Amino acid sequence: IDIFTGTLGKAMGGALGGFTTARAEVIELLRQRSRPYLFSNSLPPHVVAAGIKAFDMLASAGELRTRLQENTAYFRQRMGAAGFDIKPGVHPICPVMLYDAPLAQKFAQRLLEEGIYAIGFFFPVVPQGQARIRTQISAAHTRAQLDQAIDAFTRIGRELGVI
C-alpha cells in the first residue's frame, strides 16, 4: 500500500497543515477510522488556498527547482571545502554538524551577530552527541547571500576551533 504524507509547514511555506495521498479506497478508510482526522479541526481556508497555490507554483516552475538544486549543491560544496562536516544528501536542509550542544548554541549566537539567522539543534531535538546548526537553502537565496553565510560560517568556525 503506497501512502505518502507531507507537511505544508516547511517546504511549502505554510505555518500548519499537511496532506496524505493514496488510492481512493485507502483515503476513504482513513477518513472513517483515523483518529487524528476525526478529532482535529479544519485548516483555515487561506492556509488551504496558500498550500494549493504553492503546489501549482511547484508544478509549473521548473526553474525554481533548478535554482534550489544549484544553490543547495553550491552551499554543500563550499561548506565541505571549508572543512565543515555536512550531513550527506541533496536536500536543501543542510545540517552543519558540531556534535556539542554548548558549541552549537555559541555558534548560532555568533552567526546571529554576523547577520545570519540559523538555529542550533541539540538533544532532545536530535540524538545525544549530534548537535548541529540547521541551515535551510532556498531558491530565493542569491549567490551573494550564500557567500555571505559561508564566509560567516568560516570565520566563526575558525574562531571557535571547528575548522
PLM feature spans:
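Conserved PLP-binding catalytic core of the aspartate aminotransferase-like
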Residues: T66-G115, V125, G129-Q130, I137-A139
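Active-site C-terminal subdomain of aminotransferase-like
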Residues: I1-V90, L103
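Short, solvent-exposed amphipathic alpha-helical segments in soluble enzyme
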Residues: T21-R23, P36, R110-E113, A152
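PLP-dependent enzyme catalytic core of the Aspartate aminotransferase-like
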Residues: E113-I116, V125-I163
